[in-house]
Amino acid sequence: DPLKLCLNVENLFVALKGGVSTNGFVSGDFLKALGKDGIVINISRGSVIDENSLLDALENNILSGAGLDVFENEPKINNRFFELNNVFMQPHQASATIKTRKEMGELQFQNILNYFETGSPLTLVPELN
């Protein structure tokens, strides 16, 4: 039970896939369970944390801090985050390893090449399908 887990840890490292099944997964109840010494680190998708609950918890000292690489409405980050001194924010770069960046560049190249050869990229964005 993830909520029970939060009662027994101080740091929650979030690395979930995005989508309907994980939208708001880290709720206000999770944050309260972490307690005043709790820290949330999110490197997955901004949608997996209930951002308003996170902001309320940080502003009201229900939670000690947060490290965020992603936000719910990127690139429009909620201005309330900028008023807090208990949040570390970075610009969506948790995947920034040399190996990953090389693979991303190669995939982009293969997508363009495949598009011109077949009329469709290798990794079609579902919304454009």
Predicted regions and their residues:
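C-terminal helix-to-coil terminal segments
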Residues: 74-129
